[in-house]
């Protein structure tokens, strides 16, 4: 499995007994089922939707996220990609732009 570039996150994950260290056939089957379920459900989303994607993510590839996003019929949907982010953005060394984008998106829709 890919590991974050943040040294503190690497240490944390290496000591986490539940962190997936290898991808098995069962893992890939579960991902395939989840992907098809996500695509089917995407077509039913009509509420405001913010979709964020790390372009270095190898677990949820950007093309698959974009495919799901394109199926969302909501009239208020936003897709933001981050070139430097991987899958787990909470492990990013600097996630200030992501946090700013999320807060701005929520504030723009707050009453």
Predicted regions and their residues:
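Short beta-strand/loop motif that positions the catalytic acidic residue
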Residues: 45, 51-53, 57
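Conserved strand-to-helix beginnings and helix N-cap segments that scaffold or border functional pockets
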Residues: 25, 61-65, 91-96
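Catalytic active-site module of serine/aspartate enzymes centered on a nucleophile-bearing elbow/loop
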Residues: 78-111
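Alpha/beta-hydrolase
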Residues: 1-40, 47
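Short alpha-helix in the alpha/beta-hydrolase fold that links the catalytic acid
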Residues: 47, 61-70
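Acidic catalytic loop of the alpha/beta-hydrolase fold
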Residues: 21, 56-60
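Short, conserved loop/helix-junction motifs that constitute active-site signature segments
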Residues: 43-45, 71-74
């Amino acid at each position: 499995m890919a590991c974050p570039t943040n040294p503190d996150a690497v240490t944390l994950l290496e000591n986490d007994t539940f962190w997936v260290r290898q991808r098995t056939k069962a893992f890939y089957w579960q991902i395939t089922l989840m992907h098809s379920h996500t695509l089917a459900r995407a077509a039913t989303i009509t509420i405001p939707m913010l979709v964020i994607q790390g372009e270095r993510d190898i677990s949820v590839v950007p093309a698959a996220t974009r495919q799901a996003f394109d199926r969302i019929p909501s009239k208020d949907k936003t897709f933001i990609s981050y070139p430097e982010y991987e899958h787990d953005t909470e492990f990013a060394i600097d996630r200030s732009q992501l946090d700013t984008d999320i807060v701005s998106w929520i504030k723009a829709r707050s009453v």
